[in-house]
Amino acid sequence: MDIKEQIHGLTEEMLTNLGRLVAIDSQLGTPAEGKPFGEGPAKALEEGLKIAQELGFKTVNLDNYCGYAEMGEGDEIVGIAGHLDIVPVGGDWSYDPFKLTREGDYVYGRGTTDDKGPVLEALYAMKLLRDSGVKLNKRVRLIMGCTEETGSKCMEHYNEVAEELSCGFTPDASFPCIHGEKGLLQMMAYSKNTKIISADGGFVFNAVCDSSTIVVPAEEGLKERLEAVLAETKLQEYKVTEENGQISIYAKGVPAHASTPTLGVNAIGVTFECLEKAGFKDDFVEFYNTHIGTSCDGKGIGLKFVDEYGELTLCNGMIKTENDVISCTIDIRVPVTLKSDEVRRMCEGRLEDENGRIEILGIGDALFFPRESPLVNALYKAYTDVTGDTENKPMVIGGGTYAKSLKNIIAFGPEKPGIDYRIHSADEFILVSGMAEAVLVYMEAIKNLLAI
């Protein structure tokens, strides 16, 4: 039986095991004794390691921060790092996000592509390599993390208690290969003076706000003017209601990952833009539209920048009101050639005026491997040898992965170019055919890395 037939024969088993992982709500929870990230991530890690044990692998649980499955012998380690935690569900799902649902080649559920499915693809690639009798001159270790979506503290713990990887990849991005990841700048915007009664929207820092509700004092004719300008927007849905001297504006935009905000429609930004167009005069509305807005390029705070690997992007993910102060999250992906001190210099003097202020929470450096580095070449060759695709080339992305937390690895698959898998959105899915191909690619990748 050739390898493709073997993978085909394992498809139902892979999907059953994926269903076991998808059924676990592994969002970041409340820490408890022995469970630093709460019940869900710990349960997902336990199940992931159990599946690896059932497939015959040695497993280690590193204090419920993360764990790993391993095969082979030797001092050097080829590492694969995936994650079992998920982002909040959010949005309007057509399927139960915690029940694997198959329709033809499509399999729906939260975490199917980000990143529970890819963890299993790598695990089955390891199984098939082991069963084929290939010589393992190094150890091959699949690390299962629990907080990639919320800061990767799991990998901080790994670095403290476990061995450094010689080389490897994280199956948490796109094919053909990711040789760079933009830097991350996180900010908060705050109101100083505002007539807005309440503002609520978004559910995570790193996704475009897909729904919001803004409540403002009623003004004569404002409801009608708002309805007129909202009708001209790209919102999927909106509703303006007036009662008890207040106007409530509900807006439903389009979700997107913070690394690609132009693919979404920011419900908050559109609402604030429409408030201004409708003649609602407010200090924070003016501040927001001037400094944040809907353009996604950072020009409002002096950060518009493009290099040969991509442009700077800005995403407003959440808004809330607390103690009469409105706050907004700002997630900025910084091109790989732009250093953190340059970022601070560019936006200096642009972050505050009489209407509001923006505070820098932190700046994370970019990751970059030269295109011709041995690691990039080894992984890209695995992809092209299996798929025959030489048109798509190694790229730089705005997303951040475990490659920034672990030494000597880069992101590699499994998303195929041109397909929106709806990660961080409703109806996230993975393709069964894509899973089979990814297993093949990861088998080749591991063999190539064993030879470095």
Language-model features, listed with the residues they occupy:
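Active-site metal-coordination/substrate-binding segment of hydrolases
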Residues: 54, 77-144, 150, 161-165, ...
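Acidic/His- and Gly-rich active-site-bordering loop/insert found
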Residues: 2-110, 134-136, 251
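Acidic-glycine-rich active-site phosphate/pyrophosphate-binding loop
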Residues: 87-102, 184-185, 189-191, 241-253, ...
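Phosphate-handling active-site elements
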Residues: 103-105, 125-141, 225, 278-285, ...
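A common structural junction motif
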Residues: 85, 230-238, 278-279, 349-355, ...
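An extended, acidic, His-containing surface patch that forms the Zn2+-binding/catalytic region
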Residues: 255-323, 329, 333-345, 357-452
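Buried hydrophobic packing segments
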Residues: 48, 119-129, 158, 271-275, ...
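Midchain, well-structured core segments that form catalytic/ion-binding scaffolds
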Residues: 149, 155-335
